[in-house]
Amino acid sequence: MSKLSPARKLALDVLMEADRRGMYARDVLSSRASAKAIDQRDSAFAARLALGVAATQGILDELLDQFLDKPKKVAPRVRMALRISAFEMLYLHTPGRVAVSQGVELVRSGAKSAAGLANAVLHKVADNVENFATASDVDESERRLVRLSRLMGLPRWLCARIMASFDTPEGVLNFAGNLAPAPLALHENAFATKADPYISQLVAPVFPGCHAPVDAQVTVASGVFERAAAVASDLNAQLIATAATRPGRCLEIGSGRGTKTYVMMCQAKRAGYDRQHTALDLHDRKCDQNLARLHQAGIPGVRTVSGDACELNEVLTSFDAMLGEPALFDTVFIDAPCSGSGTMRRHPEIPWRLTEDDVTTKLPKLQLTMLKEAAARVAAGGELIYATCSVFDEENTQVVDAFLASPEGAGFTVVPLSEAQILQLPEYDYAKNLVTLRQNARGLFQSVPANADSYDGHFCARLVHR
């Protein structure tokens, strides 16, 4: 009997807690003291297993169910343990004897009576995993789609949509990097009154405030995020937040816990902009988290408000009452709810929670409603900036075009994001170059996670109110 590794045990506990509480595995990992108590290598391996299983659970079940007599009767903890071993064999190429032995012990740790079942099933997985990976078990007419689906760890409908979104096989295979950890970038606090000991050791920023990439384990262990000396923010997301930073009054819609709020306020300080920032989110809790971090970081000048962005007149009642007329903003920045298809490495549960109807109908309808509602709050000469972390045209260009064709969008014009005011400052030249590289002929920004080392998929449209 082999000894169960602490990393595999931690991964199982994290996945079960995430499943039981309806949380993301990454959030459970971050909150678990046990993840910090074990050896750093074990902790990293546990995270790799937990996030990998969360990302590929449907594919793993497809593999396992071939060898289970009664798949629906398998206890949740037993199934999760089997998934971990199947993930190791299918995606990490762990030798079968190791994965089977550890898988049996993992099952035994919570259900001794199921150890025999685990041994039989996992041996069959080990014998058949290569055929499964190459989709030699399916009809030739479906083989390419199924093979890519299994390679990427994605539902077939989502894989088919990705295939349809890119012109070349290479473009599709870019998403094979979905199972690799995403690179970490951070944005440093421009309001800090003294140098941070960790940030001061880093090389010069890529562009003002942005350090990328940074070592994830070293950075997290440094405590830089806990003391609000920086926020973790994808490089492409920082480019969008930077370009959206302008003088005057800004309404940020969909602020969440305030990562882009933090970035925009820091960039405004660096650029010397006089600015009043209102951060709106649907949830009170996220507004509170945003304000708490801003306060800790010493970042002033932000007001938060909670409410439904599809009902802005109701949400902004107090603003309107103070002014005696509808409040207008120089910038309205919408960080829209979306499929998250550009950030699946960071949120691995996304593919298995999404439906095709979400991408084609429900989300675009919501996004268009938010754009129309926000348009009425943009001052003449102001900017309406629409951003998603999706790579799908239905949520991006199609939503923008539908808005421009509507009565609410009639007074707006698409202008290149690279022409944003802040990007014309000399110190932001490199940021401007990065934005330009990600723009199409219309000036719409779209990044794609091109490989395991690249940053996330983001979209942004800059619309000026003439």
Which residue stretches match the model-derived regions?
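S-adenosylmethionine
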Residues: M1-R466
